[in-house]
Swiss-Prot record:
Quaternary data: The heme-dependent oxidative N-demethylase (HODM) is a heterotetramer composed of a catalytic alpha subunit, a FMN/2Fe-2S-dependent oxidoreductase beta subunit, a gamma subunit with putative aminotransferase activity, and a delta subunit of unknown function.
Organism domain of life: Bacteria
Protein name listed in UniProt: Heme-dependent oxidative N-demethylase delta subunit
Source organism: Ectopseudomonas mendocina (strain ymp)
InterPro entries with a match to the protein in the record: DmmA-like_C
UniProt function note: Component of the heme-dependent oxidative N-demethylase (HODM) enzyme, that catalyzes the NADPH-dependent oxidation of dimethylamine (DMA) to methylamine (MA) and formaldehyde. Functions in bacterial methylated amine catabolism, linking alkylamine oxidation to the tetrahydrofolate C1 pool. The function of the delta subunit is unknown.
Lineage: Bacteria, Pseudomonadati, Pseudomonadota, Gammaproteobacteria, Pseudomonadales
Length: 175
């Protein structure tokens, strides 16, 4: 057994590509962008399986999309496969909504790119905030300079942000 640290920590999500579930009786595709190419590719892979597509640009807000998704999942039957595509700040709240609606983790496929927005949880004030993939940021709530750790909470859908310098937690912040 090697004592070397792994390059990819266990808690950091991995997003496999191209995995469809041909055994599913219905697919629900939710995309952050228009997603027409993704829908067409999925339809080509699955053949005659029913695909419902919800695209964020078709809704006035993320909250409206979440409401429609929640209603759709409430009426869902066994055999549904949920496919979420977008950045981490988009897919993880939808993942939580789907889990709360009763879907199992194996019934949810997520695809995300590391370049998009992600959520960071500040351990000092318990605020979840959108952030880029940068390693440091200033908390929007408490003003502490945070180091973003390579630890991801699936429950929160966020990375852990801790004080970057305990000796000067408010460096760069003007009183």
């Amino acid at each position: 057994m090697s004592s070397a640290a792994t390059n990819h920590p266990f808690s950091v999500p991995r997003y496999p590509s191209g995995q469809t579930c041909p055994a599913a009786s219905e697919h629900l595709l939710v995309t952050q962008g228009a997603g027409q190419e993704e829908r067409d590719a999925l339809a080509a892979q699955l053949g005659k399986v029913r695909i419902t597509h919800l695209a964020l640009p078709d809704f006035p807000s993320v909250a409206d999309l979440q409401l429609v998704l929640s209603t759709t999942l409430k009426d869902a039957r066994v055999g549904l496969r949920l496919d979420l595509r977008g950045d981490e700040a988009f897919v993880w709240p939808l993942h939580a909504l789907a889990r709360a609606a009763g879907l199992l983790a194996d019934e949810i496929f997520m695809s995300s790119s590391p370049e998009g927005t992600r959520l960071v949880f500040c351990v000092h004030c318990a605020t979840c905030q959108p952030a880029t993939s940068a390693g440091h940021l200033t908390c929007t709530q408490c003003g502490v300079m945070l180091e973003v750790r390579r630890h991801f909470s699936q429950r929160l859908g966020a990375y852990l942000g801790v004080c970057a310098d305990a000796d000067q937690p408010y460096q760069g912040v003007q009183p």
